[in-house]
Amino acid sequence: MLVHSGDHCLLGRQAAWPEGMYSTLAGFVEPGEKLEEAVSREVKEESGIEVKNIRYFGSQPWPFPQSLMLGFFAEAETKEIMRGIELEDVRWFHVSETKELLTKLEGRFPHLDTIARRLIRHWVESVEAQKR
């Protein structure tokens, strides 16, 4: 899930990841839960941020634990981050910082073939296109 607000996006990091690596937020759908409800709940649990305008982006099969990853964009309704217990860090990244991490600092973002990376790249390109 890529949460955005203007020219900033919300990314998080797990303690087990390599130093400085950040990615989109992620989670699982609970039984009986709508996908949009899962996005809203997971973002709230991991960051304290409320979201709106949840939009489906795409999917990717994931070998472990034999899952289907679904990518969504969501617009932030609130901006104040409340750190939880699930992630080591969650923070807002400016589009210029995000673009630099995508292009220059390998190992700081998810692998090229992941839906998380595709979400981040698509968001950067969209924000830059709006500025032209």
Per-region residue spans from a language model:
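Short, well-ordered turn and helix-capping elements at secondary-structure junctions
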Residues: R13, F28, G58-Q60, T78
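Nudix hydrolase/Nudix homology domain
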Residues: P18-Y22, R83-R132
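Short, contiguous acidic/charged loop-to-helix segments that flank catalytic cores in large enzymes
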Residues: G27-P31, Q60-P63, T103-R108
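Acidic, glycine-rich loop-and-beta core segments that form the ion-binding/anion-interacting portion
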Residues: V39-G48, Y56-P61, Q66, D89-W92, ...
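Active-site-adjacent beta-strand/loop module that shapes the phosphate/pyrophosphate-binding cleft
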Residues: Q60-M82
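Hydrophobic pocket-lining residues within nucleotide cofactor-binding pockets
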Residues: V29, V51, A76, L87, ...
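The catalytic Nudix box helix
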Residues: T24-F57, F72
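N-terminal strand-loop-strand
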Residues: M1-T24, E50-V51, A74-A76
